[in-house]
Curated annotation (Swiss-Prot):
The gene is rpmJ. One of its GO terms (biological process) is translation. This is Large ribosomal subunit protein bL36. One of its GO terms (cellular component) is ribonucleoprotein complex. Belongs to the bacterial ribosomal protein bL36 family. Keywords: Ribonucleoprotein, Ribosomal protein. GO terms for molecular function: structural constituent of ribosome. SUPFAM superfamilies: Ribosomal protein L36. The keyword Oxidoreductase does not apply. Coiled coil: none annotated.
Length: 38
């Protein structure tokens, strides 16, 4: 998982989700696209 200041959608299957006031990107297609803002 990458921790980045600004999370970006990298492909079509990436989804932006907000959990516990933390913005995350989850991707079912490519696990390398997982990101967390922080």
């Amino acid at each position: 998982m990458k921790v980045q200041a600004s999370v970006k959608v990298l492909c079509r299957s990436c989804k932006i989700i907000k959990r516990n006031n933390v913005v995350r990107v989850i991707c079912s297609n490519d696990p390398k696209h997982k990101q967390r803002q922080g």
